[in-house]
């Protein structure tokens, strides 16, 4: 297994086990963290390292915005509001984010919404 493969396996195990410390340590070793994995990490950060949530949410938003060629300003505002609500443990925001992602064809990401 390549070092990239080993790092990704360690990252995925950390996500699965809920270990934010290991996931955050493994992420920089990867060439790229996909949007779905980054969203899983965001929810893990919210639970285990809430002081890091705002910055992580901004980074996830930027990653999403760079990927979605059809993102409009009003959609960006809505997504930011949802991420803010999720950071405050608003379950309605969690449900809305899952629906929001599915409506845009981001099913893998929607499946990661905790």
Each model region followed by its residue ranges:
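Long, low-complexity, acidic Ser/Pro- and Gly-enriched intrinsically disordered regions
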Residues: 1-114
